[in-house]
Amino acid sequence: MVRLISILVGLGFVGVAAWSLLWGAITYVSEPHEETVEHRFHEHPKEASFSFNGPFGKYDRAQLQRGFQVYKEVCAACHGLTYVSFRNLEELGYSEAEVKAIADQWQIEVPSINPDTGEAATRKAIPADRFPSPYANEVAARAANNNALPPDLALITKARHDGPAYVYSLLTGYRQPPANLPAESRPGQGLYYNPYFPNLNLAMPPPLTADGQVTYADGTNPTVDQMAKDVSAFLAWTAEPRLENRNRTGIAVLIFLTIATILAYLAYKNIWGSVKERKVRIAGPLEPENIARSDAAKRDEGIAG
């Protein structure tokens, strides 16, 4: 009786769940969907070509160094790189001495403790330090940015769909709001229209405003488009510094699996090929041939059939 009740209760739960899913599907199909302003005016990231795209992609070290320069001169005043250390810059091609100089000259000092008084203090950065945040805490960050919180950029390309393309599109996507944008969706005071941002308006003013804003050490023409691509590539590296190793490992695994599959197939053909060609006939005691042999043996022994 208890088992029967349990089965009935379980069936009841299954029925309720099935009905809920069915009703939700019917409602989704039958009822018209109201198109939001964000859905109408939001644009998907632009197509952006980067050297690290695809399974054979590799980082362009020169581009990463240019991107770091853009970050240092334009972005670092508001955005941190919490998970990146100064010494990681050696992977971009900087020498140990250059990294030490970059850390020592960084405009934001590292929080520390005064060994004599035990009070909070700051000190010059060293290569082992991570990039310091420009703000002491979230409250200070919001107070300095009209209550908007500047995100940390170390993992920004992994936290956003289409990663580097999104960052590139956002940096180059500032424009005047279209005339048909509803009044309630227009940017208010301290906000800027950008169709690549999810809700269309963001508190960050255009960071890249003119060609030549940064002077590249390698002589590359620093257009707004070039600077946006370079810093997007740099932020892709901060989020995935081992991307090249992962690509190489993935290719090696695919090659290994391909060879292993071929060898397994050849072994299968070698072992089972002759077995499949062999004809197997199952003969029992009631087969006419076996009955005749049995009768002959009985006669030879003088046994009556």
Tell me the role of every PLM-derived stretch.
Residues 54, 63, 84-85, 91-92, ...:
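Acidic/histidine-rich catalytic neighborhood
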Residues 246-305:
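Juxtamembrane interface at the cytosolic side of transmembrane helices
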Residues 71-82, 231, 235:
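The canonical Cys-X-X-Cys-His
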